[in-house]
Amino acid sequence: MKLNVVNLPSTDSPLRKSPGFAKKRLSDYALDILGLCEYGCRYCSSNAGNFLRIRREQFADATEEQLGKRLYPSSDPTLTFHWPNVLAKLEAMLDGKRVDWGEGRTVVFSMLTDGFSPSLVADGTTRRALELVIARTGLRIRVLTKNACVGSNDWIEFFKRYPDRFVVGLSIGTLDDAWSKRVEINTSPPSQRVK
């Protein structure tokens, strides 16, 4: 399925405190590297939730300007919002912090969207963001994704280099590949995620 990619100005703070997850003791911080992931899940709160609803018309204006038509996340599963300068923003946020900053704390990667969206994995954005956090902080990284690529030899070797820094999970809403294709439009099939 061809994606409709819209580039938006990056958030000024891709790495931020995560009070909701902190209460649940899941993470202290959240790192989101794109505005809307590529999976088009019908049930996703990022597709129809407050984060995008507040800016609904701004996003529709951007789709019209860049794609020639008004599109909304809740009605178009091919729509994704990228932040082209997110790595520069992350680097700027980490400048001046001590290398041990965040030791004993956890960052969830990503909270609102999936940082392992296929195009970000392919162009190296995902790996570079994780490398920045590893090199410039003491944070543990909690990955939750629907992309089966985290089980590939390449990614397993990457995670193994930092065994005390990563907790990696695959989200599975169903074991039925056909149902998943209707509801989690562009994700890795569940049968690939459970291998």
What are these regions (language model features)?
Residues 182-188:
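Short glycine-enriched, charge-decorated loop/helix-capping segments at active-site entrances
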